[in-house]
Amino acid sequence: MAPPTQGGRHRVTLLQVRNVTKRFGGLTAVDNVSFDVFEGTIQALIGPNGAGKSTLFNALTGFDRPDEGSVLFDGIELVGRRPRDTVVAGVARTFQNTQLFEAMTAGENVMVGTQAHQRQGFTAAMLRLPIAVAEDREARDEAGRLLRLIGIEEWIDAPAADLPAGIRRLVEIARALATEPRLLLLDEPAAGLNATETGELVQTLFRVRDTGITVVIVEHDMGLVMDVSDEILVLDRGRKIAEGPPRMIQKDPAVIAAYLGEEAVEDV
């Protein structure tokens, strides 16, 4: 069966998740979840606390191996791959709790992401051989470009330890982009952002998508989710209870009962 179309365009499946299950002892955190992510879209993953969203992210990116199921990224099986191998394949992610190198600047943290595709070896870097010097220069230029894309270039030389919470989260997004992903997974990117910063994040997500990168977000800010998402997947107690465009999700009785609530639907 051909993939559905959107706006008259043929949609290409980039990520295909089938029957993924993850258990921890007697607890089934993710229960037989299947969905597709289409190239060039922004897809949101929502649900109550404990619904299995971050566990599913971990299963997709090699941090937790699912007990059952398949994760195909552009036809490549990701189950069983290490996180670094997943990054090299073209899948990057951020975490719910930011993980920056505190002794480095914002720009240096972003430069770390470029190492996924650098050609230089350890010896070349230690001896400062021409190839290493050139790649360091390219990495700094790329860090500046990505911080401009995110809208925080002025923080490039600021120590990570001194960054406000919202800026730290945006630096982590820039570092993930530095790995040159085709698929970017963001775990609660709006956490710690004020209303102005959240509005800027919305525009950043659109700019990232417009560069050709597909985005999947886990997020509790329903205003942001409804503004940016092409598709929304809803989990509750580890199971998929709904999937579809924002307007459909807002009206789904199961979603309203499990997560959104009547008042939330009226507010978004």
Q: How would you describe each model-predicted region?
A:
Residues 2-268:
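Glycine-rich phosphate-binding loops of nucleotide-dependent enzymes
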